[in-house]
Amino acid sequence: RGVFLYIAIAGNRTRMKFIRDAQKNHLDTFQYMPSDKSRQREIRKLSQSASVQSTYISKTAGYPVYKNTAVRYFPLGEDNFAKLVEELNNANHFIFMEYFIIKQGEMWDTILEIMERKAKEGVDVRLIYDDFGCSMWIPSRFIKDMKEKGIKVAAFNPIGPVFNLRQNNRDHRKITVIDGYVGFTGGINLADEYINKKSRFGHWKDTGIMLKGEAVWNLTLMFLQTWLMLTGEKDDYSSYSPEKYQDMAFFSDGYIQPYGDTPVDNEIVGENIYLNMINKAKHYVYITTPYLIIDNVQIQTPVIEVDRT
């Protein structure tokens, strides 16, 4: 009994330290966020419901909205991958990648070759991976291999021999940032089934987006705050801003607001955003996802919307 009590107490202390560190890093990042008050006023004039949503993200999650950003949507993982490879090959200054799953195969081998080559060229190449998501798929000497290739690497929340509550905190992000003004995100991990080079459940349908412009700054700050939490290495964040390496004007595709969620507070930002979009819908709701895992609140919300119509 004493052993289990020790595990529970030690695990709780570890989790509390994790939460404190994550909260501090998250709050410290806010000073680098630009004010979006003028853009919020513009959105308010265009759409009250969009304004409520954007204001919630800005005030609660802390991520501002931007204008000067082009967006490209990829309906399939293989489309996203082809463009990702192209942009990685164009990197001149830095590459930041943060993913939940990495599996050896054609997709990862292609990306790794580019990362290694770019590191040799002097590009700052960094990788964050979730230790749980990758534990069954990468070799035990993965970190050593990456460092030998010149790639800086950090494992999110490494799995220990003793279970504690902190092990439930996982990093499900899928983010790539290239030279500060090119960003990729979506549902695509670095594994062959996501680009249909390997079939586990038939044709895999997942989506991704590419951003080019000012809004990539939110993705950069998400990565850097996690990097600081995992490594203790504090960067000069301003040296990674979108304007640093791209002096041409950014093309605007309307208002863009990348956001992040965190396990260290009681606010379920991601879920609230989706529920709010469903609740505010007037004509239709289209949902596409390879994983339909929903709770009772998420089930009831579409039902209420159907009844309302």
Could you say what each language-model-derived stretch is?
Residues Y291-T309:
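Helical hairpin unit composed of two closely spaced alpha helices linked by a short loop
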